[in-house]
Every structure is written in structure tokens, then in C-alpha cells.
A protein has these predicted regions:
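Acidic, surface-exposed loops and disordered segments
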Residues: 1-245
Length: 245
């Protein structure tokens, strides 16, 4: 699969339609992804209408690709279908807990990545929206998600109208541990991040954000402690609302 080596997030799309036939084929093929106990603990809400995309946009900080993409997929951790099946077959389900959410979320995210690979191999562009877990209650309300269904990922999909450069990646040695975890020394951290910090585009991020280091762009500007704690609380409240805790 050559597309994975050249993949980039696509945020601008042409007006060319993504056919139901192609979308359904990709979704069906993605169902071959690994799944816990062969239960397929996920569901996908397809949004095509302008009205539907506009309703979802605020939950994703009004990023333009939400309304600009032909298709938006919201992938959900879904233990509701399995629970109702069990209840209707004399089973006694006990999936209103954090372990069950983790199992369903893992299934959903595996499906998301498999679908992404297949879609991009077919020539489509995609963008994974991490904002799904920032304000999940807005998505729950908009999509009318019932108990034991929790949004965990969003993909925008369409035919690319841009060809952005590849994003940088850390070297392979930064993620590999042999036989046991080897903790990170200051020297290793310097080595792992040297190339990233030396990129002109990242130096520009440091300059325009008026900070001293690239790390501060992330900790002080993009993903602050205050925001992470507030969104964590909102996520926990959404999990409780959806019956997982």
C-alpha cells in the first residue's frame, strides 16, 4: 500500500461527489478490521447534508473542512447494539463500565484507521478530527446518540483539492523499545527532537507564538493544562451521560 507512505491530511475538497456505492464499499471492506470478540463495537453516522454539517461544525471549533467536505463520518464506540441483542436473547449484559467503553473505543478507532487507509488508497482525501473528544456532548446532542453510544472519532472525506507537503515524523528509534521499556534520558530527548526543532516551519511556529521553544507552542498555546483538564471533565460527564460510568 503506497498511499500510507505519502499520506497527508486533506482539508480542502473538490465539488466532485463521493458516491454512495464507493462509500458503502469502503465501509464494508473496513469491517474486516480486528474487533474484540468479533462483536464490532462501533457504529458510523454519515453526514452529507449541508444542514447536518453546519450543526456539527461548532463541536469541531468550526474548522472549515467540516462544512467543506462532501462527507463527514462520526465513528462511535457502540455497546448499545450488542447490549440490546443480548437482552433480546436471554443474555445478561454488563457493559455499562469503563472497560467496555475502552473495548468499544478500541474497535471504533481500529475501524477508523482501516477505513482511512482504504479511502486514501482509492484516491480520496481524509482528515481525522481529534476535536471529537473535546466537546462530545455537543455531538451526542446533534446526532441524537442514545445510551452506550459515544463519539470517539470524526473523518472528513472527499476528493482532494490540495496536495500539502508531508508532515515531519520522529525517527523510528524514538518509538522502539527492545524487550523492556527504556526510559528517556535528556540526551535521547535531544536526539529524538533535533530534526523536528530544526525545521524552518517549526522555528516559525516558535517565533509567531512568541515563545522560546517548540515544546512551549504545544504546552502553552495549543494544548494547555487548563484546557485539557476542562475537556477531560466534559468527557467524563459525557461518558456518565451515555451510561459507561
Amino acid at each position: 500500500m503506497t498511499s500510507i507512505k505519502n499520506r497527508t491530511s486533506i482539508r480542502k475538497y473538490s465539488t466532485k461527489e463521493v458516491s454512495d456505492e464507493l462509500l458503502n464499499q469502503l465501509l464494508e471492506d473496513a469491517m474486516r478490521t480486528p474487533t474484540m470478540g468479533n462483536l464490532q463495537l462501533y457504529s458510523i453516522v454519515i453526514t452529507r447534508s449541508e444542514e447536518g454539517k453546519k450543526a456539527l461544525a461548532p463541536a469541531h471549533f468550526n474548522q472549515p473542512m467540516v462544512t467543506g467536505a462532501p462527507v463527514v463520518l462520526t465513528i462511535c464506540a457502540d455497546y448499545r447494539r450488542t447490549t440490546l441483542w443480548a437482552e433480546n436473547r436471554k443474555g445478561t449484559p454488563g457493559y455499562d463500565n469503563i472497560l467496555s467503553f475502552m473495548n468499544a473505543a478500541t474497535d471504533a478507532l481500529l475501524f477508523t484507521q482501516t477505513f482511512t487507509n482504504l479511502a486514501e488508497e482509492a484516491g480520496l482525501g481524509t482528515c481525522f478530527l481529534g476535536t471529537t473528544v473535546y466537546m462530545p456532548k455537543m455531538i451526542i446532542d446533534t446526532l441524537k446518540l442514545p445510551k452506550l453510544v459515544m463519539p470517539v472519532a470524526t473523518l472528513t472525506i472527499g476528493w482532494p483539492a490540495e496536495h500539502p507537503a508531508l508532515s515531519d515524523r520522529l525517527p523510528l528509534r524514538s518509538i522502539i523499545h527492545h524487550e523492556h521499556f527504556e526510559d528517556y534520558t535528556p540526551e535521547k530527548i535531544d536526539d529524538f527532537y533535533a530534526e523536528k526543532e530544526a525545521l524552518e516551519e517549526n522555528k516559525e511556529f516558535v517565533r509567531i507564538n512568541n515563545v522560546e521553544t517548540l515544546a512551549q507552542v504545544f504546552t502553552d498555546i495549543r494544548y494547555t493544562k487548563k484546557d485539557c483538564e476542562a475537556m477531560s471533565q466534559g468527557f467524563l460527564e459525557a461518558l456518565k451521560q451515555q451510561g459507561f460510568i
